[in-house]
């Protein structure tokens, strides 16, 4: 088995950046979900409800993040200067401090999404640790999927889907479907990762990231429910992980299952 994809999502719930190599810090991949879009009530906006976020692109250029909208793009610093923080709602009533970014970008985002919104950066990040924290992650720092499990799912679907439906940070190429259910700990290159729990999948998997349309029969969730039910309810695909031993990773690295 080997690592075949590495993805980071600088702006939560938007298009990923695929990289050939990176560094796994104790809190995940560099620059992963350091930014988030919020609405007029300072609440998190995600592509579950606002699929057009999936067509917001970004790329790292030197010391800046370029945010690319369909009609224009903006440069914002990777290490923003501190300003007056706002309290934003992440999950439920959980409040987190965040820094507003660029009024012109906010206006363009609002126009694109059709409602008032802002891009914010996690104020909990210090400049020295900016690349180390997935501050707006849903659950654990890392999400891993495997190619064999996707192939098995596609074998059950009338229409095949891509791995991008599952928004993984790490994709492992392997031959046996769902074998990752038994993993407790793995090594990728010099890094060691610990499995915390399976990833429960949500309605976002039913949205085509290219056309932004939702599947009329709720696929792949409906098919996953026939054979990937979790004990706690819901359906699972992929694993949530934490970093036990930090270090560099690269596409092609061997993936080893540890006791």
Per-range role (PLM):
Residues 1-259:
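Metal-cofactor-dependent catalytic cores
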């Amino acid at each position: 088995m080997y690592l075949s994809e590495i993805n980071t999502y600088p702006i939560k719930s938007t298009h990923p950046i695929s990289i050939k190599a990176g560094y796994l810090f104790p809190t995940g991949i560099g620059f992963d979900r350091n930014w988030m879009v919020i609405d007029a009530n300072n609440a998190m906006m995600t592509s579950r409800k606002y699929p057009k976020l999936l067509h917001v692109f970004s790329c790292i250029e030197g010391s800046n993040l370029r945010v690319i909208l369909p009609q224009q793009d903006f440069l914002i610093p990777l290490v923003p200067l501190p300003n007056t923080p706002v309290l934003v709602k992440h999950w439920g009533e959980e409040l987190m401090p965040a820094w507003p970014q660029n009024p012109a970008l906010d206006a363009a985002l609002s126009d694109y999404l059709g409602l008032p919104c802002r891009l914010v950066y996690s104020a909990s990040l210090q400049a020295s640790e900016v690349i180390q924290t997935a501050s707006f992650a849903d659950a654990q720092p890392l999400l891993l999927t495997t190619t064999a499990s996707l192939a098995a799912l596609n074998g059950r679907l009338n229409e095949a889907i891509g791995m991008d439906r599952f928004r993984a940070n790490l994709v492992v190429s392997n031959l046996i479907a769902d074998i990752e259910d038994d993993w407790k700990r793995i090594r990728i290159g010099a890094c060691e990762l610990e499995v915390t729990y399976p990833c429960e999948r949500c309605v976002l998997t039913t949205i085509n990231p290219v056309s932004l349309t939702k599947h009329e029969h709720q696929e792949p969730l409906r098919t996953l429910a026939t054979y990937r039910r979790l004990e706690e309810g819901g359906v699972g695909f992929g694993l949530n992980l934490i970093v036990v031993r930090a270090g560099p990773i690269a596409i092609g690295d061997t993936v080893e299952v540890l006791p």
